[in-house]
Amino acid sequence: MARLCAFLMSLVVVSYWSACCLGCDLPHTHNLRNKRVFTLLAQMRRLSPVSCLKDRKYFGFPLEKVDGQQIQKAQAIPVLHELTQQILSLFTSKESSTAWDATLLDSFCNDLQQQLSGLQACLMQQVGVQESPLTQEDSLLAVREYFHRITVYLRENKHSPCAWEVVKAEVWRALSSSANLMGRLREERNES
């Protein structure tokens, strides 16, 4: 029940993502793709999460770097881009293609690729807007290290079905945090 509630809450947050909160022109379809990404990820379940409890692992998600109060709008775009790129890399790997239903996986990756394209366009618009390079690089490095730990975990567990279920749950968490960041930035923009 708690997971269903979290899923529905994430969909609500994602549905209110606004391109204006990033200060760039993301198409309206970006919001729809975000909803679809969550829906597809939920549909990709192959095993009951209960059967994989013994395989759970703490990956050290850099919450303060992705959803912390100190992250600024200019920092958000590169961090969200990196997060999306890393998720796409995980799910386009050769090992991933054997773990999931091909149709769902293709749709999921296609929607992530479209989101990545929109974020890339935002990055290009942001050229010249400088955030502290050290702060931004610190956040990007934290995201990369987090996904490196996930990749190592998958390799150590020989890309087992339970390992992929654990990773899918972790990706859900990462996507939820990015949705929370977008919601917070939107609120900040509306308040100003």
From Swiss-Prot:
> Would the keyword Magnesium turn up in this protein's UniProt record?
no
Q: PANTHER family from the xrefs?
A: INTERFERON ALPHA-5, TYPE I INTERFERON
Q: List the disulfide bonds.
A: C24-C122, C52-C162
Entry-listed glycosylation sites:
N190
The text of the family note is:
Belongs to the alpha/beta interferon family.
Q: What SUPFAM superfamilies does the annotation carry?
A: 4-helical cytokines
Tell me, what is one Gene Ontology molecular-function annotation carried by this entry?
A: type I interferon receptor binding
Q: What protein name does the entry list?
A: Interferon alpha-1
Matching CDD domains: IFab (cd00095)
* Miscellaneous comment text of the record: There appear to be at least 12 rat interferon-alpha-1 genes. The antiviral activity of this interferon appears to be independent of glycosylation.
Domain of life where this protein originates: Eukaryota
Q: Name the lineage.
A: Eukaryota, Metazoa, Chordata, Craniata, Vertebrata
Name the GO terms of the biological process aspect. Answer: adaptive immune response; B cell activation involved in immune response; defense response to virus; humoral immune response; natural killer cell activation involved in immune response; response to exogenous dsRNA; T cell activation involved in immune response; type I interferon-mediated signaling pathway
* Matching PROSITE patterns: INTERFERON_A_B_D
GO cellular component term, pick one: extracellular space
